Design a protein with these regions (language model features):
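HhH-family (HhH-GPD) DNA N-glycosylase catalytic core used in base-excision repair
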Residues: 1-162
Length: 162
């Protein structure tokens, strides 16, 4: 059984009634693969700290997405940054959150999806996905560096190296 088949098996066998208050609960609000990818990435970025705070932050973001996370990010403009004024999470600053969405917009428009960004740095012959995850994080850190000239500690925490 390859990795994809193994993950699919566990995904189908998982009892979703026990999901809440896990951040993964937010992925199940969407059906479109690109929306699920976006919400999955966002949930993973904000999934640390107090469970209630994680849930509150993700609810605020999901509300901003207005039911279309991928479309929200694809069409995001710097002028939309004020929508994140009230969103802070642990040690992510408001500026970190704004820059995150600027970069997500840039990279999704360049590569078409989160999946494509991941696949660009993933080698199917690798024994596990560690290098793929590492390359994914490096891709975003490099994009932040190219766009903003420096990378805050908050941004580095969003895209850690395994």
């Amino acid at each position: 059984m390859n990795l994809k088949q193994n993950l699919e098996y566990h995904y189908k066998a998982f009892d979703r009634t026990k999901l809440e208050p896990d951040p993964l609960q937010f992925l199940h609000m969407f059906k479109d693969e690109v929306d699920i990818e976006v919400v999955g990435l966002i949930a993973s970025i904000f999934a640390y700290g107090n469970v209630k705070q994680i849930e509150n932050t993700l609810k605020k973001l999901i509300t901003l997405f207005n039911g279309k996370p991928f479309s929200f990010i694809k069409n995001f403009a710097a002028k939309d940054s004020q929508k994140f004024a009230a969103i802070k999470h642990q040690f992510y600053s408001e500026d970190d959150v704004k820059k995150l969405f600027v970069i997500l917009n840039k990279e999704i428009n360049r590569h078409k999806s989160i999946k494509q960004i991941f696949l660009q740095g993933y080698n199917i012959s690798d024994p596990n996905v560690k290098n793929g995850i590492s390359n994914f994080s490096k891709h975003f850190i490099n994009s932040f560096n190219e766009t903003f000239g420096n990378v805050s500690d908050g941004i580095k925490f969003m895209f850690p190296l395994p």
